[in-house]
Amino acid sequence: TNRALLLTDEGQALLPGLAEAFALMHHALASLETLDDTGVLTVSMAPSFAAKWLVPRLESFQSLHPDIDVRVTASMNLVAFADDGVDCAIRYGLGQYPGLVVDKLLDESVVPVCSPALRGMGAPPDLLRDVTLLHDDSPEQDASCPTWRMWLKAAGIDGVDAGRGLHFNQASLVLEAAIAGRGAALAKVQLAGEDLRSGRLVRLFDVSQPVAFGYYFVCPPAKAAQRKVALFRDWILRETKADAAYPKKN
């Protein structure tokens, strides 16, 4: 049989007060996330972006805000902000992140690079027929990011065995191998920016090929109101704006 639950007269009398109390409790719990300014900022991003872009610049943020301790979580996994204890993230994608605050940081493109010593061994495209090709097999690749086979075909360069060479599962390892003179790499320009500016890497061709993915700052709306997140967001927007205006050629 179906039985309905009915409040007693005493329960009916208490109901308005209980509803108000639960509403206040919900509001207080929701406010805790906004008020959590412990001084520890946890940021998630891809390993290669952390190693090649963020780390060289992180001292700037620390000098501006010494009271904020930054914890970098390097992972390709999409974080669950509440469950993983992450305040904000830098994501490589198309910018479609429903329910999150999203800021476009940087576009990305790809260009062949090598060490200055290797470049001195010959001129492209002949050089590509003689050197080891370095391949990026990382999950950071997107469908619009060319492989060596795709790039060589688009450039009209033949006589190069596009399948040979060394393979790595992280973009930063590809760049480190190129810096060490192990071969030529198809480098993401944003990741290789510091190495190109410093002369550790040089371009083999002037033309870079844009890719569909870019880099985005994301965080939950409640996190965006926190001082530590707001300061990091403002800082990285300034850094990426300056970076986009600074040439990455050598």
Positions of the model-derived regions?
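Basic, amphipathic "hinge/linker" alpha-helix immediately C-terminal to the N-terminal HTH DNA-binding motif
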Residues: T1-L24
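A short, exposed helix-loop element centered on a Lys and neighboring polar residues
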Residues: H26-E33
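Immediate post-signal peptide segment of exported/extracytoplasmic ligand-binding proteins
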Residues: D36-L41, D126-D130
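Central regulatory/effector-binding core of bacterial HTH transcription factors
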Residues: T38-P98, K249-N250
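Short, well-ordered beta-strand segments
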Residues: T42-S44, A89, L134, A185, ...
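C-terminal effector-binding regulatory domain of bacterial HTH transcription factors
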Residues: D67, V189-E194, S198, V207-N250
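Acidic, Gly/Pro-rich loop/turn segments at junctions of secondary structure
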Residues: R71-F168
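Hydrophobic hinge/microswitch elements
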Residues: D158-L204, P210, A225
